[in-house]
Amino acid sequence: ALNAPKSSIMPLVHTMTARNFIYMQKDTLRYRIGVATYSVGVAYNNRKTSLQFIQQEMNNITALSNETCQLGIQSRTMVLYIAKKDSPQPIRLMSSVGKQLPLYCTGLGRALLAYKSEEEIRSLFPEVLTAYTPHTIATINDLLKELELTRQRGYAVEHEETNLMVNCIAVSLDYNNAPIAALSISIPTFRISESKEKEAVQILWEAKQRIETHFKMYGVDFGN
């Protein structure tokens, strides 16, 4: 039993009754679990963790695009790859979960960086950036310009900046108005085209909307 006076408990009981979390049986004058409590319990038991839901969406992204889909989160100045769905194509991106690459030269990283302030960006990186290929952005000023384009487009792009012959289109996954992860489609150069990139953006945006709706309904849970 609750160790509290009846005068303190009754307002709570009235509120829970009004909202159908409990109800009183007229014959016994005892309170029972109401339909709202039952609904909450069913929703909890049927929920998927955020990661499970995102992985389901990643399967769909790969099925629609025929390309590799990856999920990443920020780890200081790096993007940490936490999930991947391989392309069914014989020639595809070779990468692995657990790998880390710099935020500044990856599509996933730029999607995560795009809505940070210039001050935050400058605190993360030196003026001159390490080049991984001849196409890698070379300076922090160039990065800031690219992030402005990312904000205008609503998605990030990266063309052969970490691996030659590999291109990436990415969107952020936002919760409470801040990016908490990013989702990408990776496409080999010999398969990419303007129409292919446009298709990838559409697929990613539709997945982004579903995932962010899930976040709003259930919160963010990357648990097991």
Where are these regions (language model features)?
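Amphipathic alpha-helical regulatory segments at dimerization interfaces
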Residues: 1, 53-64, 153, 210, ...
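N-terminal helix-turn-helix
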Residues: 1-52, 213
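A structural signal for short hydrophobic beta-strand segments in well-ordered beta-sheet cores
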Residues: 22-24, 71-72, 173
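A cytosolic small-molecule/anion-sensing beta-strand core signal
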Residues: 26, 35, 75, 175, ...
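Amphipathic alpha-helical effector-binding/dimerization core
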Residues: 32-127
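Cysteine/selenocysteine-centered motifs that mediate thiol-based redox chemistry or coordinate metal-sulfur cofactors
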Residues: 120-125, 208-224
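Conserved acidic, metal-coordinating active-site core of Asp-based
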Residues: 132
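Extended hydrophobic
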Residues: 135-210
